[in-house]
Amino acid sequence: MQKRNPWPAWVLGCLALFAAGAAWALPPPPQSWQPDVDRLVADDSAHPPPQNGVLFVGSSSIRMWTDLAADFPGVPVINRGFGGSAIADSTYYADRIVIPCHPRLVVMYAGDNDIAEGDTPAQVSDAFKAFVARVRRALPDVAIAYISIKPSLARAALWPQMREANRMIADWSRQQKDVTFVDVAARMLDANGKPRAELFRADGLHMDAAGYAIWVQALKPVLARHGFAVH
């Protein structure tokens, strides 16, 4: 995975404070995912995505979820995973890959790379707040769900920081309207609190079908709560 320089703390702070109402331009991301985003937009032109659906956005764990539609049969799902992105990257590109789809529910998975590349739990939490503010500025009624940062074999040493970021985001989400924290971490750990090896591909970072099955079961009640028929 190509490294990026972490978004500076002052940028995340400004996003969190002002995204909801100020008229300003986001700074360019430290690493450009422009080619990935251009491909998503081009695909939208050729195959317009459903409106009022469930839009999944975030990093490679979303991008590599190739069975997304099959995992939620009958649900209008849109996959907007790109690169090895950070939360702030989804905020930067929201105007192009999130807002035009007018989803009823946005499901985000990101934050894993943020911690791996040096961000603190507080920076990750602030980045998610900024994402919510940016999307809600355009779509005030959209529901947003955050999939907890997953424990993994490859990043086991970073789990304490990831767990703290999860705690901060969960605490904040409980105080918001229609923002849901979806805890997948507990089901991805064994009895000794270690990542379950059978849930991961050979790289120890990305999930196999068994890992995604845990996510599906955790997300079904969220989708049902927002009016989607799940089986």
Can you name each region flagged by the protein language model?
Residues A94, F128-A133, N166, A170:
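Generic structural signal for well-ordered alpha-helices
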Residues L153-H231:
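Catalytic His-Asp segment of secreted/periplasmic serine-dependent ester chemistry enzymes
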Residues Q2-C14:
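Bacterial N-terminal signal peptides that target proteins for export
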Residues L139-A143:
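A short helix->loop->beta-strand "cap" motif at the edges of active sites that frequently abuts
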Residues I62-I78, D89-S125, K129, A145, ...:
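Oxyanion-hole/transition-state-stabilizing segment in secreted/luminal serine hydrolases
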Residues A25-H102:
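Serine-esterase "nucleophile elbow" of acetyl-processing enzymes
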Residues V57-G58, G81, G111, V184-A185, ...:
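A secondary-structure boundary/capping signal
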